[in-house]
Amino acid sequence: GSKTFITTTDGNHGRGVAWTANRLKQQAIVYMPQGSAAERLANIRAEGAQAEITDMNYDDTVRYTSELAQKNGWIIVQDTAWDGYTRIPLWIMQGYMTMALEAYEQLPVKPTHIFLQAGVGSLAGSVQGFFADIYDSSCPLTFIVEPKGADCIYQTAAANDGSLHSVTGRLETIMAGLACGEPNSIAWEILGNLSDGFISCPDYTAAQGMRIL
């Protein structure tokens, strides 16, 4: 039968949902947070999805998307978890491990350090978990890196009180794909237990990195 899949994205995740729905001859609806690039919006629409940029930040857009899904009986495909919604995010995190495996298979030597970017922490948690499983007690030192304007994982680690901590507001950063203010609860269970450090970076560090690369 006909299904409608709905999601919030900064770009790549939503494009993947749109592509998959199109191949399955189903409908995809994609919402993007304020500040999302017009080119990314166009790429998602090119996959046949109904897509638009909201005037909300990422986390508020996720809540809006969830409300629409519940109201209309649509299937929400989100890469972050919350109370009562964990199965699909877990599947997505398991899928992210494919990238970790591909990187691992191409490593000429064992790395000494691993730096992982984090938005809600899903990708970082997946990669951290993969390498912790591969290397066990000899896992490379692993650091989680976030933009200073949206450093919810860093704030949760700094508080160290057993609770998740959010960052609110516009979440302004040039690191658009990482402009997320609320941690994925599943990812934090991994990151909080296995990561060696957490780094909150001002935008100029990302700009300098892009110039170097």
Q: Each PLM stretch: what is its role?
A:
Residues 2-6, 15-68, 152-166, 187:
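Active-site-proximal loop->helix
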Residues 31, 54, 79, 145-147:
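Generic beta-sheet signal
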Residues 183-213:
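Active-site-adjacent helical/loop segments in soluble small-molecule enzymes
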Residues 24, 47-48, 72, 138, ...:
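Short, structured coil segments at secondary-structure junctions
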Residues 64, 83-193:
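Glycine-rich phosphate/pyrophosphate-binding loop at beta-loop-alpha junctions
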Residues 11:
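Conserved catalytic/binding loops enriched for acidic/polar residues
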